[in-house]
Amino acid sequence: MLRWLTAGESHGPSLVAILEGLPAHVQVTSDDVADALARRRLGYGRGARMKFERDEVTLVGGIRHGETMGGPVAIEIGNTEWPKWEKVMAADPVDPVELESLARNAPLTRPRPGHADLVGMQKYDFTEARPILERASARETAARVALGRVASNLLEQAVGARIVSHVIELGGVRAPAGLWPQPEDVDRLDDDPVRCLDADTSKLMVEAIDQAHQDGDTLGGVVEVVVHGLPPGLGSHVHWDRRLDARLAGALMGIQAIKGVEVGDGFELAATPGSRAHDEIVSGTDGLRRVSGRSGGTEGGMSTGEVLRVRAAMKPIATVPRALRTVDVATGEAAVAHHQRSDVCAVPAAGIVAEAMVALVLADAVLEKFGGDSVRETRRNAEGYLDTLRFR
């Protein structure tokens, strides 16, 4: 079983991520992790922070000479802006007189609608939002993306599965239906300003972002994660918490700003007659296959062996330049929310984070099904399982 944990704040010295339960000999390097983190910064409409933020990756433990050793993997991602924040975010006490002179330490008492600010202050008994927003920030997803790269490497090396994501909707502009990216499309997608497969749609999405920026607004959208090469039988039908689609949905909903998830054609199936909603099964030269992919590659809480597709809907960024109404909790008076630099749209980056979460869930499911203390053992077990399937 895989377990993962992250720690750290948006403006703290670093983020730390730990992944436990990996077999030995998963090939992974600091360059792999750095590449994944660079992809997280992609996308038209990102804020100024993406221009100067750099992720300093240190593989702290669990990896030797480019291979995991079977113990927990620990990754640290340094914050290059830490010198600006070392007094405000210091772990040890700082002289109150010195803190009062720092503009960055001004109390954040005007909670932002759509953020964790207000309810976090209520729940954890804080008088201002800084202790809440620092951890609630999407900066934390960098740690998950780092772990997701390790999980992705395991999936490819153990069972040959590969993951790719793309943007299918942004600001109300939707790509044509039925476009499913292949693993070889990754570079082309990453070169597109909004990571959309359709060039004409991409141009319209960029125009929508430009208009939102001009209007002082933000935009959301929908990303789709596609997984090729999964074996059938990951997950289980026997308990709710072992169902693969439930685990995927929970992982995606755990990404900041995600408000909805669907597997396959999801909500569209609610309006489709049963005679057309399900993937019929046929027998061909390559064995049993489903003639469509409406289910998204899962049935009964298990992977079917077909292409897996999951979608996540991201709400618009809650830090809106056109400041929203709020209440100053220090005075009880009506006010406008705090505003700081932010993205106009982070939907393309959300796809990279979604890839990471899907990879972590699937890697856990693969190890649950096939076990193994080394990648070779996991791969051998998976191959033996496929060779002995009663129905193929």
From Swiss-Prot:
GO MF, any single term: FMN binding
GO biological process: amino acid biosynthetic process; aromatic amino acid family biosynthetic process; chorismate biosynthetic process
First-tier enzyme category under EC: lyase
GO cellular component terms listed in the entry, alphabetical order: cytosol
Names of the cofactor(s): FMNH2
Homology family: Belongs to the chorismate synthase family.
Protein name in the entry: Chorismate synthase
Organism: Nocardioides sp. (strain ATCC BAA-499 / JS614)
Gene: aroC
